[in-house]
Amino acid sequence: MYKYIWIFSLTMVFGQYDYSLEDLNSTSEYYQESVGTSYFPNQVTLHYFGHYNWGTCTARFGQLNDLYEYLDSSGYDQVKLIGVGKSQHMNWLGNWTNENNAPVCADQSG
């Protein structure tokens, strides 16, 4: 048991990944702003990493966007969603931005 607590503690200390990417979704309230892990301090943020061109990823991002909008309209504005895909699949970006209002970013790092 102590081994798992130690691993969890190490993850909390050293497992902090930070990124900042431009929001490419024109219907998002953060459009063209650099969003990432540090952009929403003291808020719950879901970071969804997937492929713009895969049907499963597109469907899941749509479901998460629906949940994000439901929570926001219910007064839970402390919950945020950011979708991140690979830049080499930019021609399928519309799969995630059409009918979705959450920020969508493209990871430029290979």
Predicted regions and their residues:
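Conserved redox-active cysteine motifs that mediate thiol-disulfide chemistry
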Residues: 41-66
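Sec-dependent signal peptide recognition
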Residues: 1-9
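Short, flexible hinge/linker loops that cap or flank conserved catalytic cores
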Residues: 38-41, 75
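Conserved segment of the thioredoxin-like fold in thiol-based oxidoreductases
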Residues: 59-110
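Serine-centered coil/turn micro-motif
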Residues: 26-29, 54, 74
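N-terminal "domain-start" segment that seeds a small globular fold
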Residues: 11-38, 59
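Short, glycine/acidic-enriched loop or turn micro-motifs at the edges of active sites
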Residues: 26, 51, 110
